[in-house]
Structures are given as structure tokens and as C-alpha cells.
């Protein structure tokens, strides 16, 4: 059994008036895939609780969380994510509480002064980022874009299909 006590040679003595070197921790991962890589475990084995309801995300929900480009929530050294149901509830709450205004179709380009391709738009229902095709579809059909909490919202193809709005 190894001696657990350190000898004087093993202890770095800091002279009076100087400071000990700062130990910097690596940055905490923002994605579930990044967390699994840091822990060197398969993504299937990475169990992360929902910040709102406390249930552990399923493998599919973990993949959706990363696909939506949401960030992990760190409280001390405890990590939380957001399950599918709570993402929808959060999106609905934000829409109802922080709605600012609505533009139709290509009006979003005139209001923002940017091309629709350069505007970040999340789904107002599930919080996914809309891709270029989804944004062009909204513009072409003259459907609404909503400004909510300083961000733009629309409806993604998955939610359109779910709500039969196509």
C-alpha cells in the first residue's frame, strides 16, 4: 500500500508575497453529446434530467435537444436539459408572455434589414431552428413570423405536419 502522506519535496511551497498558480477547469460542455464525450460514455448512457419536470431525457429527447441547438443548464456541477414536453410548454409560455409583433412572409426582410437566410428563426412550438427551406416556405405562403422576446419564431416542418398545416 502506497504512503498517502506527501513529503516536503512533493509539496510546492509558495513564498510569502506570491500567489499560487491558478488552476483552471476546462469549460463545461453545452451539449449532451459533448457531455457524453467528456465523460467518455456512449450517448445512450448519458442520463440528464429535465430542468423543469425532473424526469430524465430519453435517448431520442437527448438527440432532439442537441439538434435544436439548446444549451445545457449548469447549476454548480449539476447538469440539466429540457425534455420535449417542457420545450413545448416553455415555447408556449414565452409566446404568450413575451409576444411583440407579427410580420407576414417576406416582410421579415424589410423589418430586419437582413436576408431571410441570415435571420435565426426558431419554431414557436418545439424550439427547433428553422432551416432555409422552412423559412422560404413561410415566405412563399405568406405565413406569419412572430417576434417573441427579441427573437423570431415561425413553424417548422415537423410541427406543420403534426398540426396538418400544409
From Swiss-Prot:
Q: For this UniProt entry, what is the primary localization, expressed as one broad class?
A: host cell
User: Which ranges form a coiled coil?
Assistant: none
Subcellular compartments: Host cytoplasm; Host nucleus
The reply on keyword Transcription regulation is: yes
A single GO BP term for this record reads:
symbiont-mediated perturbation of host apoptosis
Q: What does this protein do?
A: Plays a major role in the induction and maintenance of cellular transformation. E6 associates with host UBE3A/E6-AP ubiquitin-protein ligase and modulates its activity. Protects host keratinocytes from apoptosis by mediating the degradation of host BAK1. May also inhibit host immune response.
- Quote the protein name from its UniProt record: Protein E6
What lineage, starting at the top, does this entry show?
Answer: Viruses, Monodnaviria, Shotokuvirae, Cossaviricota, Papovaviricetes
Amino acid at each position: 500500500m502506497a504512503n498517502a502522506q506527501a513529503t516536503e519535496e512533493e509539496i510546492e511551497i509558495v513564498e510569502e508575497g506570491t500567489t499560487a498558480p491558478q488552476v483552471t477547469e476546462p469549460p463545461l460542455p453545452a451539449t449532451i453529446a459533448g457531455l457524453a464525450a467528456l465523460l467518455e460514455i456512449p450517448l445512450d448512457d448519458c442520463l440528464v434530467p429535465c430542468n423543469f419536470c425532473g424526469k430524465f431525457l430519453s435517448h431520442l429527447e437527448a438527440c432532439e435537444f442537441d439538434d435544436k441547438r439548446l444549451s445545457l443548464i449548469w447549476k454548480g456541477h449539476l447538469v440539466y436539459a429540457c425534455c420535449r414536453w417542457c420545450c413545448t410548454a416553455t415555447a408556449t409560455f414565452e409566446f404568450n408572455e413575451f409576444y411583440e409583433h407579427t410580420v407576414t412572409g417576406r416582410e421579415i426582410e424589410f423589418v430586419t434589414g437582413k436576408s431571410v437566410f441570415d435571420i435565426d428563426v426558431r419554431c414557436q412550438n418545439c424550439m427547433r431552428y428553422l432551416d432555409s427551406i422552412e423559412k422560404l416556405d413561410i415566405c412563399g405562403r405568406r405565413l406569419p413570423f412572430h417576434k417573441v422576446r427579441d427573437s423570431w419564431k415561425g413553424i417548422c416542418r415537423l410541427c406543420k405536419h403534426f398540426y396538418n398545416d400544409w
